[in-house]
Amino acid sequence: MKFSALLSQCGLRLILISVVSLMGFLVGPSFAHAQTAPSENESDTGIQVDKPSKLRNLVPAEQLERAADKQFNQMKREAAQKNALARDDHPELIRLRTIAQRLMPHAARWNPASSRWAWEVQLFGSNAINAFCMPGGKIGFYLGILEKLKLTDNEVAMIMGHEMAHALREHSRERLAKNQLTGIGAGLLSSILGLGDLGRTVMDYGAQLTMLKFSRDDESEADLIGLDIAARGGFDPRAGVTLWRKMSSASNKTPPQWLSTHPSGTDRI
């Protein structure tokens, strides 16, 4: 074997090792949760959570909030065109906003920046059992989750607190940053190995499974912080048990827990 060929092969091995090491370092638990420490406000909450990953700084918060605001407005426009956006006098929307008003004052202890957010609550006329809170405090509930589960105010507060916690802890921002890094690493590794599109697809699947662990951790953290926010708003945290029992009963067909981004209802109980 010629020296140049040997050198080239060694170089490829070195690059390959570097890429694999870099991906493991950047998206692995050892870095993402390198500093397992109390939140800045543990003295106020008594709840210990991991410090947010520094990777989130790769995605500017302001840019993400602007994108979320744009997406939320688009959702409202599309829903309004289908007559599926609740009017301000809709009883369920009034109920949601009343509950939100009791929770919002307790958000800043988990993210001081939320004090400047333009919080907004909307109700969409969909049968889906779902709710969300986008970065920047854009809260959306689907009518299906209220009607199909027959939620009490306490149970609504549990869901709303949970979704608010995702935004407050910047889970979307962190996951986007990690997805960008795994995408870059997967593409580079596939090119080095000469696997082409097939290799990229396989690597992407692996990247998704890597991300699921973080997502499941995010869900558990949101459960804990959501309970804190709801309880401080004067709602009964025991409603979390009845809520997840309802969720479990409503989920007739769910993916295996290991491949799910949400822990099962029974695990949450």
Describe each PLM feature range.
Residues 2-269:
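A Zn2+-metalloprotease active-site environment signal
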